């Protein structure tokens, strides 16, 4: 029996919601920068009998019996992660990027220690010291931002803040920063103030794996990431380290420090994704992600819409909508009405609240997986510009939606193979 047919019989309500979500993904242009489309193989691993197995501990050091096969799977995931990022140690158990970060904090910090990360409104992340997050409640968080003129990192200012505040941990890596990160400069500052250096590469992990962005491991004490986004795996976390002995501290902070049993079905899916990312085709994919982002940015700029920092080096294109006198909240609603999913986002020195914002964040990873090339992304850019520059024109709204649906038909999600894979 088809798996989804079985679900439809046992729980038709959930089955209908899943089918509705599948239809939404097929008929919308996914431009949320933190999303991607995992392969059918990754999803099959997630939906396997491994979901039944409890396996507290590390491979060969479990607290439960019957772990011989999940040990093999987890060891393979670790080996592939180490090879992919040229690391000497890896822990594949974190359930998310946020939990990977929490495990690092538990290993390196005491409550009240000073941590230093990018201001959330400039492109940082909640887990880098935001006052609404554990990282900002348990630790003394100080923040750096970007240069007001260039919207790029200002290392002179970062050094000044570090010298003044003497953080125990400096965090680099961001959720809305479209430029290359100079990890070596961060290392120099960390050494000067005696701080640990952590890189959170959740957004750029796939580009790092493809050697299209500098690898932080030669410079950072520890690296965390998610396994979805540009890495195109299941939703999960990963911790990497260049020093195997140092890495053992993080093993203990994952389990029993912050988690119980690992999700072995997700770890299997991570192993599959790491294996996919080790193939030459993945480098081609990552190259296309960047090419597409540059075309998307240049198309929008040509229509009079400002892009934060004037362009992009990765998959992120961050629109500064002050250039067209619009808020991110309104822009999000406008593109959503024509089947484009994105997210409102603060821009550096944003006068609006986080619930309104002056920015719209776009990303090219998901549609590149779907097969979109530069020509297609030029079309996407024109559609977005048409919609944002004509917010009250119902005719243009209808035309934009028709163009979106035509693109979805030209680049079908999973090329129609999804149904066949789950029989």
UniProtKB/Swiss-Prot annotation:
Enzyme Commission number(s) from the entry: 2.1.2.1
Pfam families recorded: SHMT
Compartments, record wording: Cytoplasm
Principal place of residence: cytoplasm
Molecular function GO labels: glycine hydroxymethyltransferase activity; pyridoxal phosphate binding
Residue numbers bearing the N6-(pyridoxal phosphate)lysine modification: 229
Positions with a binding annotation for (6S)-5,6,7,8-tetrahydrofolate: 120, 124-126, 245, 353-355
Marked site positions, Plays an important role in substrate specificity: 228
Reactions catalysed according to its record: (6R)-5,10-methylene-5,6,7,8-tetrahydrofolate + glycine + H2O = (6S)-5,6,7,8-tetrahydrofolate + L-serine
Pathway terms, separated by semicolons: One-carbon metabolism; tetrahydrofolate interconversion; Amino-acid biosynthesis; glycine biosynthesis; glycine from L-serine: step 1/1
Gene3D superfamilies: Aspartate Aminotransferase, domain 1, Type I PLP-dependent aspartate aminotransferase-like (Major domain)
GO cellular component: cytosol
Cofactor(s) listed in the protein's UniProt record: pyridoxal 5'-phosphate
Single GO BP term: tetrahydrofolate interconversion
Keywords: Amino-acid biosynthesis, Cytoplasm, One-carbon metabolism, Pyridoxal phosphate, Transferase
Family indicated by similarity: Belongs to the SHMT family.
Quaternary structure (record): Homodimer.
HAMAP family: SHMT
Functional description taken from the UniProt entry: Catalyzes the reversible interconversion of serine and glycine with tetrahydrofolate (THF) serving as the one-carbon carrier. This reaction serves as the major source of one-carbon groups required for the biosynthesis of purines, thymidylate, methionine, and other important biomolecules. Also exhibits THF-independent aldolase activity toward beta-hydroxyamino acids, producing glycine and aldehydes, via a retro-aldol mechanism.
Protein name: Serine hydroxymethyltransferase
